[in-house]
C-alpha cells in the first residue's frame, strides 16, 4: 500500500509505503478492503497518515504485469542480491527459485511482479522499497512516451483504468500524465520499525482482544500458556501522531 503526494510547487512526487501488518482499529490495515470496501480503506489511510486523499487506484497484480509488458519492460537497479528460496519460478520449462544479483536489470512484467511480490528474501520493508523502485522504472519509461506514442499510451491508460478499481477517468489520467511526467520522484520512504513503528504481538480474537490460551490441564493454571497468534506493527507507545508527523516531515522536506 503506497500513499502518494504530488507537490506542484516543488514539482515532486513523494511515495510512502504503509506496511500491510500495521494494526489499526482492531485489525491489520490490509484486511480493511476485503471487509468494508475501498471507501473505508481510503478513510482509514487518511486517518493513519493525517492527509486528505483525493484519488485512489487499486491495481491487480496481473494488470501490473500487463502494463509493464505493454511498455516494453522497465529498468531497475538492485542494490543487493535478491534471493528467495521459497519463491518457485519456471521459465521455458526450466524451474528454479527466485534469484537476481545486484545491479541493473531490464524486467518484463513477470520478472517485475516476482521482484515486487517476494516476501522471504529480505524484510517486508525491503519489499516495499522494491515496489517503489519498480514504480520509478515505470515512471522513467513513461517519460519517453509522447505524442508520437499516442496509441501505446492510450493502450496503457485504458488497460490501467478498465482493469483496476479507481475514481480516475481516462481523460484525467492522461492530463495527470502530461502534467506530472517530468516531476522528480522521491521514493524509498517506508513507515517502519526503523523510524516510528514497533513490532507488537496481538491476539487473533478481534472481538475480545484476549490472548489465545492453551492448557495441558485446565484445572492447573501453571500448565497454561498464552499464545499471541498475530505479529503486527503499531506506532511506538501507540502514539499515532508519530506516523502523521513522520509523513508530514517527508512532505515538508
Give residue spans per PLM region:
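Non-catalytic, solvent-exposed segments at the cell envelope interface
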Residues: 1-253
Amino acid at each position: 500500500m503506497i500513499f502518494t503526494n504530488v507537490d506542484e510547487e516543488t514539482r515532486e512526487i513523494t511515495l510512502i509505503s504503509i506496511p500491510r501488518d500495521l494494526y489499526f482499529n482492531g485489525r491489520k490495515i490490509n484486511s480493511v478492503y476485503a471487509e468494508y470496501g475501498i471507501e473505508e480503506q481510503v478513510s482509514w489511510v487518511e486517518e493513519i497518515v493525517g492527509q486528505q486523499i483525493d484519488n485512489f487506484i487499486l491495481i491487480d497484480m496481473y494488470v501490473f504485469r500487463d502494463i509493464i509488458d505493454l511498455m516494453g519492460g522497465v529498468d531497475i537497479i538492485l542494490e543487493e542480491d535478491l534471493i528467495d528460496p521459497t519463491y518457485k519460478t519456471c521459465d521455458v520449462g526450466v524451474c528454479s527459485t527466485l534469484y537476481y544479483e545486484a545491479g541493473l536489470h531490464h524486467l518484463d512484467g513477470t520478472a517485475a511482479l516476482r521482484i515486487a511480490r517476494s516476501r522471504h528474501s529480505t524484510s517486508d520493508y525491503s519489499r516495499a522499497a522494491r515496489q517503489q523502485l519498480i514504480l520509478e522504472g515505470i515512471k522513467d519509461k513513461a517519460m519517453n512516451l509522447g505524442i508520437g506514442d499516442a496509441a501505446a499510451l492510450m493502450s496503457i491508460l485504458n488497460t490501467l483504468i478498465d482493469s483496476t478499481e479507481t475514481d480516475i477517468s481516462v481523460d484525467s489520467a492522461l492530463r495527470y500524465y502530461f502534467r506530472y511526467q517530468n516531476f522528480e520522484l522521491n521514493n524509498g520512504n517506508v513507515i517502519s520499525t526503523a523510524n516510528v513503528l514497533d513490532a507488537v504481538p496481538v491476539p487473533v480474537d478481534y472481538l475480545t482482544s484476549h490472548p489465545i490460551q492453551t492448557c495441558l490441564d485446565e484445572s492447573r493454571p501453571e500448565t497454561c500458556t498464552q499464545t499471541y497468534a498475530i505479529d503486527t506493527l503499531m506506532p511506538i507507545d501507540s502514539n499515532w501522531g508519530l506516523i502523521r508527523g513522520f509523513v508530514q516531515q517527508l512532505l515538508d522536506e
